[in-house]
Amino acid sequence: MPSQVFNRHYWSARELVVLGVFSAAAKLSTLLVALVGGGMNPVSLLAKNLIFTTLLVVMLYKVRKPGTLALFVLVNMLISMLLLGGSVTLLPAMLLAAGCAEAAMVCAGGMRKPWAPVLGVAVYDLTSKIFSLGVSWLFMRESPALLYVIVPIVVIGYVGSLCGLFSGVRADEIQSLLVVMDAQFIPQIR
């Protein structure tokens, strides 16, 4: 019986590069939208969440392994903490949201299902927004009126995330179509 060779590494180098590039692109593009958009206005909130969610959906279509979303969240929060001074208190909430999304994808049939990345990102976006509101409530429970100001901002951001789900699927379909067209065109040149 031939011995089977087991891969010691869960993610390949290509998958880790894809994850890192998409994480950096998501953080950089949302930062640029915030700077160009002039801060926290509804248009820039929608655009930031739309771009972030689109990139996350496309990345999950590229790297279809359990745990990818959690690793993306870790890398993204690390970039946020180092570059932007992001709050460390959001890391447990984001990891819990990533765990809920990973569990939803597994319960729905696994990462190989065609709609699994969209489901995972939808659950992640919803639970991360809810958990971040929970963290905000924890810090502002002496003055709950401040939380009333935050809720509409989070809701506007989630609308952008919902739009990003559809644009992420569309971007992946367009990219897949370009790969097929490229594969058909290259043999004709040679």
Task: Give the positions of each predicted feature.
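Alpha-helical membrane segments and adjacent membrane-interface helices in multi-pass membrane proteins
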Residues: 44-103
